[in-house]
């Protein structure tokens, strides 16, 4: 998902903001490709440079209306006739890896529910110096969604029973929405040597 304006970060089009010399969107795209997924990047009129970058990289795109995250996702599902399990992921999650995606999908398959969301403990956000947008108890733990989900596209027009997965992966707490988040993630890379 790369169609939002990303105005809070104030560093140009957010998907193209570079971490260690590479756009954040590229980390996300390469992680999904590395996990064996076909990717379709949802863009909009709000991110013309991102659309051009995707074209240059050879990534397939869908140009949505730019109304909002959920609206653009479901517009894409309807217009492209996607079926079966579909990942959605924010473009500003540079700590994501192919191994994380593979583990998430295996857990999704084991739970037997059509919808699946990934959460990490709130304490990870606090330790990271990032501000969570939403907190709810998951498995008796205050937790925050990370922007990585799976839905059954075949049931896109229906309410879907959701499994909330508490995933203890600190790197997923870095959903880069503002300069403070960005700076915190750079420090995390240095401290934990993710190899980005």
What do the predicted segments below correspond to?
Residues 91-94:
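The conserved acidic donor/metal-binding loop of glycosyltransferases
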């Amino acid at each position: 998902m790369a169609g939002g304006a990303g105005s809070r970060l104030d560093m140009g089009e957010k998907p193209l903001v570079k971490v260690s010399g590479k756009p954040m969107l590229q980390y996300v795209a390469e992680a999904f490709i590395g996990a064996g997924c076909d990717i379709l990047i949802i863009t909009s009129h709000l991110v013309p440079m991102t659309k051009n970058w995707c074209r240059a990289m050879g990534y397939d795109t869908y140009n949505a209306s730019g109304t909002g995250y959920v609206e653009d996702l479901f517009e894409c599902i309807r217009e492209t006739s996607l079926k079966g399990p579909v990942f959605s992921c924010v473009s500003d999650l540079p700590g994501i890896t192919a191994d994380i995606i593979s583990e998430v999908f295996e857990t999704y398959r084991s739970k037997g529910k059509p919808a699946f969301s990934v959460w990490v403990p709130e304490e990870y956000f606090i330790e990271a110096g990032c501000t969570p947008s939403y907190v709810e108890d998951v498995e008796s733990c205050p937790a925050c969604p990370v922007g990585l989900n799976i839905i059954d596209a075949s049931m896109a027009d229906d309410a879907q029973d959701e499994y909330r997965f508490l995933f203890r992966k600190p790197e997923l707490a870095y959903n880069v929405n503002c300069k403070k988040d960005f700076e915190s993630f750079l420090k995390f890379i240095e401290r934990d040597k993710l190899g980005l």
